[in-house]
């Protein structure tokens, strides 16, 4: 079991500065650096993964598109979606990439179960699904045994922009969110529950809230 997982709660932040800060943190961390998870919401943005194909961007319109270095295809971020960036020393944790993805998916499945929502993962399509509709997306990058990027959970947001793309490269993939399945929901409460599930499933002994910026 690893020691302590640090969380930074960043609120609503533009995507690109957070992306640059993630890269910088990953490049500069030492073997003794504490693992961190950054919890954030983003203004409306489409992000294109390393394998992303232009044909999956149907009509982006006025929503900006940012090319990233995470795995996967195109997805959408917007207010009311809870994003968690996992800045972990995966080698130190002793996880393979597939195990890390599975642990993240199980954390999300247990979080949703706490709201009486039955969800599942798919072996051939990372993420978490409810009755075939996607409620959470995953996209990671591992560099020198350290992870960055992470997950996006649809909580209480406008899902319409997903219709401007083929989400995660799948034409016609239905998207859903927690509000539509469990009724009115407080994002702060979901954030707290997600923290607990990630600590549990990633096998940390405890968690702490980190203060200060990410510049």
Swiss-Prot record:
Keyword annotations for this protein, in alphabetical order, are: Acyltransferase, Cytoplasm, Transferase
Q: Which GO terms describe its biological process?
A: protein modification process
The entry's localization annotation reads: Cytoplasm
InterPro entries reported for this sequence = aa-tRNA-synth_II/BPL/LPL, BPL_LPL_catalytic, Octanoyltransferase, Octanoyltransferase_CS
Extract the SUPFAM superfamilies matched here.
Answer: Class II aaRS and biotin synthetases
The pathway that the record names for this protein is: Protein modification; protein lipoylation via endogenous pathway; protein N(6)-(lipoyl)lysine from octanoyl-[acyl-carrier-protein]: step 1/2
Q: What is this protein called?
A: Octanoyltransferase
Give the E.C. number(s).
2.3.1.181
As its record notes, the protein acts as a catalyst of: octanoyl-[ACP] + L-lysyl-[protein] = N(6)-octanoyl-L-lysyl-[protein] + holo-[ACP] + H(+)
At the top level of its lineage, which domain of life is listed? Bacteria
Question: What EC class does the entry list?
Answer: transferase
Question: Catalytic residues?
Answer: 168 (acyl-thioester intermediate)
For this chain, the family text in UniProt reads: Belongs to the LipB family.
């Amino acid at each position: 079991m690893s020691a302590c997982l640090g969380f930074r709660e960043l609120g609503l932040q533009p995507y690109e500065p957070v992306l640059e800060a993630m890269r910088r943190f990953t490049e500069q961390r030492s073997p003794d650096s504490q693992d961190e998870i950054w919890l954030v919401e983003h203004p409306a943005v489409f992000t294109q993964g390393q394998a992303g194909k232009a044909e999956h961007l149907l009509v982006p319109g006025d929503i900006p598109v940012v090319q990233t270095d995470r795995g996967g295809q195109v997805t959408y971020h917007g207010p009311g979606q809870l994003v968690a960036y996992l800045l972990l020393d995966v080698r130190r944790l002793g996880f393979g990439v597939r195990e890390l993805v599975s642990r993240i998916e199980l954390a999300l499945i247990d979080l949703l179960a706490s709201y009486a929502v039955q969800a599942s993962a798919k072996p051939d399509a990372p993420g978490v699904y409810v009755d075939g509709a996607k409620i959470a997306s995953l996209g990671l990058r591992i560099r020198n045994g350290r992870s960055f990027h992470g997950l996006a959970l649809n909580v209480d947001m406008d899902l319409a922009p997903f219709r401007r793309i083929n989400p995660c490269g799948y034409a016609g993939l239905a998207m859903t969110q927690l509000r539509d399945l469990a009724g009115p929901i407080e994002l702060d409460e979901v954030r707290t529950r997600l923290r607990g599930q990630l600590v549990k499933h990633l096998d940390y002994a405890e968690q702490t809230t980190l203060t200060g910026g990410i510049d």
